[in-house]
């Protein structure tokens, strides 16, 4: 039995998220499993580094699978990409030892959320960014983003249906910056709660629109109640861009996405 790690890029527009759903509901995981199972000529189960909601994208989702099939790495990639839908692509594959696990060996995960701030919606970026037409106080939003760094109880910033046993997370960095008409939130943490990034972005957007002051974030944390925070930002602008592992696994580190933004590393 061989174990392989894979790096996957996908658009989440047509899928109900990463994780396999009930029959008849398209998921990224199930779509890839069906193709890999054909190539391996045996059932394949894919284990992802994380879960993404419906409509959320990824530029380097890490996953792993076990198989008895013997194929060259190029054969796996070319075979899979020739059969996968055009909105899913295997970017790399590497044979691993059985100690590796895409989810449980991950030490951190990283997301970017992209807002297009302009009067008119961008037709060619439909569902790839979140469009905000109102004028935003970007400098205020930049300062507010840093309030989420460090170790906090994120009860207020997780979905009511979140199944995690505990809401404390350590955020290594939470930075918002301008890139032309785009606003990009870059956030890395040891783990994320359901809707955590989208709720943080929703809070920042409301601050940018002058709905409350930066210090109100402290009161939100203290409340430990989802109702104390504002909107959940749409899934459209959210990208899973990286997953981090101990150096011993030596996984490929592709450029951070989304690639069409041409952002600095």
From Swiss-Prot:
EC number of the protein: 5.4.99.12
Binding site for substrate: 111
Entries under Pfam families matching the protein: PseudoU_synth_1
Keyword Isomerase (UniProt): yes
Reaction(s) this enzyme catalyzes, per UniProt: uridine(38/39/40) in tRNA = pseudouridine(38/39/40) in tRNA
InterPro entries cross-referenced by the UniProt entry: PsdUridine_synth_cat_dom_sf, PsdUridine_synth_TruA, PsdUridine_synth_TruA_a/b_dom, PsdUridine_synth_TruA_C, TruA/RsuA/RluB/E/F_N
GO biological process: tRNA pseudouridine synthesis
Protein name: tRNA pseudouridine synthase A
